[in-house]
Design a protein with these regions (language model features):
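Boundary-flanking segments of nucleic-acid-binding domains in nuclear regulatory proteins
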Residues: 1-226
């Protein structure tokens, strides 16, 4: 049996092969494979990734990697191994640590940026991309990552919140500006004046709540314009 390859059995008795590697006293699973050769190739690729920093790199400025689609090792595991090699910290999600932020690689062509304050959360929560939105499984529920910024479900970018630098992949706190934190409320511009569109007093809130909401919105808009 090749190095790093082990035989395993499914419940129905079918044979499959597991591959793993040990680096800096950390035992790392590389995945399960249908053939012994696939498992062996993956192990050899992992050895090369961990030993050849000149061949396998992550460009933190361009958010690119040297990963090739022809490689047998999954892209997610590729990022995990390079981060472990370069930063000495094993993280189970495809995260690469930088000085004041970290990169979360969803795919070879899609990378999100987060503050280091969010590292613990995203090291234990895997991000799922669906329909242009990003979610995590939190206590059995799919939760939008926008909720961590006080942005409600079904909020619209450009109306309810904006990315200050125009990069919708940059989720650092200082880059996100929440315009509207309220349900059923929107603001429109007409003849150079701001108009607040409030919920109906008879259906969505009481008259007193309606007045309080209007005052809060006016104060919030004033702060945004200062």
């Amino acid at each position: 049996m090749p190095a790093g390859v082990y035989t395993a059995y499914k419940k129905d008795g079918t044979v499959y092969y597991r591959s793993s590697i040990t680096h800096k006293n950390k035992h790392i699973s590389l995945g399960s494979f249908s053939s012994e050769n696939e498992a062996a190739v993956t192990y050899n690729e992992a050895c090369e990734i961990l030993s050849r920093s000149d061949l396998h790199i992550i460009n933190t400025e361009l958010h690119t990697t040297s990963y090739s689609p022809d490689m047998n090792i999954p892209f997610e595991k590729y990022i995990i191994l390079i981060n472990f090699r370069d930063n000495g910290i094993y993280i189970k999600t495809p995260v690469y640590l930088c000085k004041k932020f970290f990169l979360y690689f969803l795919s070879p062509d899609k990378t999100l940026i987060f503050n280091t304050d969010s590292l613990f959360y995203y090291s234990t929560h895997k991000i799922i991309a669906r329909g242009g939105y990003y979610y995590v499984n939190d206590f059995g529920m799919q939760t939008s990552i926008l909720s961590r910024y006080g942005i409600r479900a079904h909020s619209v970018e450009g109306r309810d919140y904006i990315f200050k630098n125009g990069d919708s992949c940059d989720y650092r706190y200082e880059n996100i500006c929440v315009i509207n934190r309220y349900n059923g409320v929107s603001m429109i511009e007409k003849t150079a004046k701001n108009y607040i569109v409030l919920p109906s007093t008879s259906t969505e809130c009481t008259r007193l709540e309606h007045m309080k909401l209007k005052m809060k919105l006016q104060l919030h808009i004033t702060k945004l314009l200062i």
